[in-house]
Regions:
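Acidic, low-complexity intrinsically disordered segments
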Residues: 1-56
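Structural motif
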Residues: 10-12, 92-96, 427-430, 449
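Acidic/histidine-rich catalytic cores and adjacent linkers
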Residues: 33-48, 52-65, 69, 237-247, ...
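RNase H-like nuclease fold core
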Residues: 18, 25, 71, 78, ...
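Eukaryotic helical DNA- and histone-tail-recognition domains of regulatory proteins
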Residues: 97-109
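Short, charged amphipathic recognition helices of the HTH superfamily
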Residues: 107-123
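Hydrophobic/aromatic interaction determinants used to assemble and anchor large protein complexes
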Residues: 281-282
Length: 519
């Protein structure tokens, strides 16, 4: 039996209007939920589309990177297979070309012979090239050939030639004379100091005797080969100065100039070298160095004293003294952390007792440094003393430094008098000392064995060589020339005599042992 909804409603306790309202609200609620879920579904579908697009983009980037990796590996493999050195036909019979020789020689100038060999080995291994590497003996011989050839070549500027001359010694009585040539007409612009490339090594020669007569002979030989110079620049040694006078017979306007820095050091020595307070400081620096170099004050250890040219190397000592004075007066300094006040005073407090003297010495050093820089960069010319006076200024506070300034200015004024209008000449041998330094760097630990045939390399150390230079030099100078030069200048060396002494002793010991056995 079918029951109508109207009849069914009659059974409900709630009125029909209430039931209708509930049903309507339920329908509205469900409709709202459906709408909300539809929106959420749309959002999720949008996010999914974005993620799919991002994933697709990443996949494309990965594919591109994979292609780049493949291409890089292909190029690497191709490079490994195709690395070739420039064409370099061999010179002579040793199998190495001018390019390889110049490369090895230039490396040796910087890192030594053994270092050059190791550098070449590392470089060729990195390139994946299997080829022969020249040995240190070959590189040494090449550098000697280049050096000897350099000294054999004529000059084209004898009219403006300035010769710098000095001696150097290492062990024993033997000294080496080094003569450098500078073209005064091609000096660097004012404000720039001479460099090694402005120099030519004219002669490097060992000898046991370098008296005035010996130097006269060497000056004459230099003039025969290169022409009479415009000037000879020396450090003030008597034999160098007096020996050069012979050149005035060849050229009346020849000048003998003294190195400014050596002169300044001599003046400083005369002003403060005999000061008892200065001597006391020197002694206390030595004892202080010994007492603190293995303590918590090790970072405040004074510099090692210079055994030679002490008054040319005061800057380091004075810098230490002024720093120590400041630390004593500045307890909060970071450099004093971890050092008790009583320890500071015990080991370094003595420096404060010389505060007034240190101020004088430091002003003298600052004056000398400024003057040396001026001479190095400007040279000697008419008016140099006037410009030097302007550089020094008139604010010196101490009588000692004021007297030093007067004497330095007077020295330059006297030296510039013979110069022609517009002429500029070097007045510093620092570049010569630096040239000796290049040789000592190459020589390294061998300096304890005295001078050897390695000296032949010195002329080739002043500037980098080129393949073209190697070809020309090797065509003129052979390995036999190196042997002849060595036999002439080094018939024996300290090392060879040392070996001979040991050999003689061993021979005598064997004879004595044999005779004792017979008895």
């Amino acid at each position: 039996m079918v029951t109508s909804w109207y009849e069914k409603v009659q059974e409900f306790k709630s009125p029909i209007r209430v039931i209708a309202a509930v049903l309507l609200r339920s329908r509205e609620t469900q409709a709202a939920k459906v709408c909300e879920l539809s929106q959420r579904l749309a959002e999720l579908e949008s996010q999914l589309d974005q993620q799919q697009q991002h994933l697709q983009q990443q996949q494309q980037e990965i594919e591109a990177l994979q292609q780049r990796v493949v291409e890089a590996e292909r190029q690497r493999d191709q490079a490994r297979q195709s690395v070739q050195l420039p064409e370099d036909p061999p010179l002579g019979t040793h199998g190495y070309g001018a390019r390889m020789i110049s490369l090895a020689v230039n490396l040796a100038r910087s890192v030594g012979f053994r270092g050059a060999v190791r550098t070449l080995q590392v470089f060729f291994q990195w390139l994946g090239i299997d080829r022969a590497i020249p040995g240190r003996t070959s590189i040494r011989n090449w550098l000697q050939r280049l050096g000897i050839d350099e000294m054999k070549q004529p000059l084209d500027f004898s009219e403006s030639l300035v010769i710098m001359v000095d001696h150097s010694n290492q062990i024993g009585t033997e000294k080496v004379m080094l003569a450098l040539g500078v073209n005064a007409a091609a000096m660097p612009e004012p404000g720039n100091a001479l460099t090694h490339e402005h120099l030519r090594v004219l002669e490097v020669k060992p000898g046991d005797s370098w008296k005035t007569a010996d130097m006269e002979r060497e000056y004459e030989a230099l003039a025969d080969q290169y022409g009479a110079p415009r000037a000879v620049l020396i450090d003030g040694a008597v034999e160098l100065r007096d020996g050069a006078e012979c050149l005035k017979k060849r050229r009346e306007d020849m000048l003998v100039l003294r190195d400014f820095k050596h002169y300044a050091a001599n003046v400083v020595k005369s002003l403060i070298g005999n000061d008892e307070r200065f001597k006391e400081v020197g002694g206390k620096i030595g004892s202080t160095r010994s007492s603190i170099q293995q303590t918590e004050l090790a970072h405040l250890t004074p510099p090692s004293p210079k055994q030679k040219a002490r008054f040319m190397n005061l800057s380091g000592t004075l810098a230490w003294l002024t720093m120590t004075l400041w630390l004593l007066r500045t307890p909060e300094a970071k450099s004093r952390v971890g050092i008790r006040e009583e320890r500071m005073q015990e080991k370094l407090g003595w420096v404060a007792e010389y505060g007034d003297e240190i101020a004088v010495w430091q002003e003298c050093q600052d004056l000398v440094s400024a003057a040396v820089t001026f001479i190095n960069e400007q040279g000697l010319f008419q008016g140099a003393s006037r410009e030097l006076r302007a550089v020094i200024g008139d604010k010196l506070e101490h009588g000692t430094s004021q007297e030093l300034a007067q004497r330095l200015i007077a020295f330059v004024a006297e030296s510039e008098k013979p110069l022609r209008e517009g002429e500029r000449l070097p007045m510093s041998t620092e570049i010569l000392e630096s040239s000796f330094g290049l040789y000592k760097q190459l020589e390294r630990q061998h300096s304890k064995s005295g001078f050897t045939s390695l000296l032949a390399c010195l002329p080739a150390l002043l500037k980098p060589t080129t393949p073209e230079r190697v070809k020309v030099a090797f065509a003129r100078t052979s390995a036999e020339d190196v042997t002849a030069w060595t036999e002439k200048h080094f018939p024996s060396t300290v090392t060879s005599r040392r070996h001979a002494a040991h050999a003689e002793h061993q021979s005598a010991l064997k004879r004595a042992t044999a005779e004792a056995g017979v008895l």
